Amino acid sequence: AQLGMKVALIDGDKVGGTCLHRGCIPTKAYLHAAETAEAVRESARFGVSSTFNGIDMAQVGKYRDSVISGLYKGLQGLLKSRNVEVISGWGRLADANTIEVNGTSIRGRHIVLATGSYSRSIPGLDIGGRIISSDQALQMDWVPSSAVILGGGVIGLEFASVWRSFGAEVTIIEALPHLANNEDEAISKQLERAYRKRGIKFHTNTRFASATQDDGGVHVATEDGKAFDADVLLVAVGRGPVTEGLGYEQVGITLDRGFVITDERLHTGVGNIYAVGDIVPGLQLAHRGFMQGIFVAEEIAGMNPVAQADINIPRVTFCEPEIASVGMTEKQAREKFGDRVRTVEYNLAGNGKSSILATSGI
């Protein structure tokens, strides 16, 4: 719209998608509440007298909702100010230039697919009751006394951090060799050390076998014979693309395990149809989708923008301690460049700001 084009935005839910309503924003609100709880517990060392009386989840929920509501209203106002026509309903591709929604056909010279993702589970493990996804975890009005988290990636690590700060006993089950396994091994090991110090238990190289639930809790078994009991089991094994039943394959778009395959310019190879965000293989990050949306808009406008590789996109896990990275891991760099790679480490424990905040740094 900013580039002078007429735009219709079709959305089956609220504009803002997963990030605003069920992902980044509510999770970060919880993380800030958790950080505040830790600050109260540690306040005496800074000369501040305070008492920690527990977590009021009803108030945490109100705080979360107020943040989401403010951003949602701002986004609605932004779309209105740009004269973007917002159509509520699930669209379905009818052909290379037509989307059907609410019984109406809408035609456009260009179509951008951005249908997002959903919380995945694993075969044989159904979400329900005490077995929850991040969607249900963000709506809980109580703090579990204990939780098992299946998955040691971004989602699992952030919820582990929140619940531990809220007072829960937390155990993470991860099939890969390390927590945050996609990061540099040195970072993963430092994070594991920090989580041990916080009292967060974890089992890596451990594969899930089964889970049952009853009024007393959820009971989890792993393939190596371990058993875990908790109030809830959070399934945090990643997110899957929302592409099924939307007509993508019928018009000739190539899917791989549900993901839309594009070229480096995010074109699907069909007509003037592009795809962005979580439905495109790669990092499932809101700012990646945002960047891709800008790229496609400029591409459609004939501005010939420079294509961006996922390797250049920053990645952050907002646990405690936080992790941030960009570019290759050391392992990836050595595989590509061999002995020409030089590694330099600087321990932030010696940084003045770290000393003031009384954080160890990594």
Model regions and ranges:
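Glycine-rich Rossmann-fold phosphate-binding loop(s) that bind the pyrophosphate
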Residues: 12-13, 150-153, 278
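C-terminal catalytic lobe of FAD-dependent flavoproteins
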Residues: 226-252, 270, 325-362
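Glycine-rich flavin
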Residues: 2-143, 171, 176-180, 185-187, ...
